[in-house]
Amino acid sequence: MSYAEKPDEITKDEWMEKLNNLHVQRADMNRLIMNYLVTEGFKEAAEKFRMESGIEPSVDLETLDERIKIREMILKGQIQEAIALINSLHPELLDTNRYLYFHLQQQHLIELIRQRETEAALEFAQTQLAEQGEESRECLTEMERTLALLAFDSPEESPFGDLLHMMQRQKVWSEVNQAVLDYENRESTPKLAKLLKLLLWAQNELDQKKVKYPKMTDLSKGVIEEPK
């Protein structure tokens, strides 16, 4: 075949056959899983997986305890307590990462609104967040979006109701987790996430070149569709 010719299109069955012929070492898969559990702070799961797989974590699992406490506080909406613990562990972290500190303060404001503490929410926004809103257009926009929840009798059902979802707390925790790991000079992104990003990048490159190939359309389920 010359370079001017287009390669034959590959079917999904042919693609799957090629994938099935590739061998991935079980130990490599186990290391990826352990890396994910440690990076995300799942201590108990990492301990059980170590017993089942024989794979040793890259760090002492006892070092995960403080991050686990911070995660539990944030996911329960105990933001001020989480800030206090972060400051006790790494006093300079929030001073040097102003956006992270703003997002934690914003989350505390969200929790006040969730509890229908309107006056406390307005006072907190004015005394703790107004200055950051003046310094950053992005912060101002996020603060205005948060305060807009007060205009609705049922803020959960408002256009800004996503701020009251558990995913919002999870988002803040993920940001804190990454910042703490970076501050401690530890790996902050699981290797598994990097591999998935690499897959998406490769598919995007093929899409831009108008190549027809069996595409993975659902990463969580591993769904691969026929070439289109």
Curated annotation (Swiss-Prot):
GO terms for biological process: positive regulation of canonical Wnt signaling pathway; positive regulation of cell population proliferation; Wnt signaling pathway. Keywords: Cytoplasm, Nucleus, Ubl conjugation, Wnt signaling pathway. The keyword Nucleus applies. It is found in: Cytoplasm; Nucleus. Ubiquitous. Polyubiquitinated through 'Lys-48'-polyubiquitin chains, leading to proteasomal degradation in the absence of Wnt stimulation. It comes from the Eukaryota. GO terms for cellular component: cell junction; cytosol; nucleoplasm; nucleus; ubiquitin ligase complex. Residues 25-57 form the LisH domain. Residues 116-212 are annotated as: Interaction with CTNNB1. Its main location: cytoplasm. Residues 63-120 form the CTLH domain. InterPro entries: CRA_dom, CTLH/CRA, CTLH_C, LisH, Ubq-SigPath_Reg. GO terms for molecular function: protein homodimerization activity. SMART domains: CRA, CTLH, LisH. Core component of the CTLH E3 ubiquitin-protein ligase complex that selectively accepts ubiquitin from UBE2H and mediates ubiquitination and subsequent proteasomal degradation of the transcription factor HBP1. Acts as a positive regulator of Wnt signaling pathway by promoting beta-catenin (CTNNB1) nuclear accumulation. Homodimer; may also form higher oligomers. Identified in the CTLH complex that contains GID4, RANBP9 and/or RANBP10, MKLN1, MAEA, RMND5A (or alternatively its paralog RMND5B), GID8, ARMC8, WDR26 and YPEL5. Within this complex, MAEA, RMND5A (or alternatively its paralog RMND5B), GID8, WDR26, and RANBP9 and/or RANBP10 form the catalytic core, while GID4, MKLN1, ARMC8 and YPEL5 have ancillary roles. Interacts with RANBP9. Part of a complex consisting of RANBP9, MKLN1 and GID8. Interacts with CTNNB1, AXIN1 and GSK3B. Belongs to the GID8 family. This is Glucose-induced degradation protein 8 homolog.
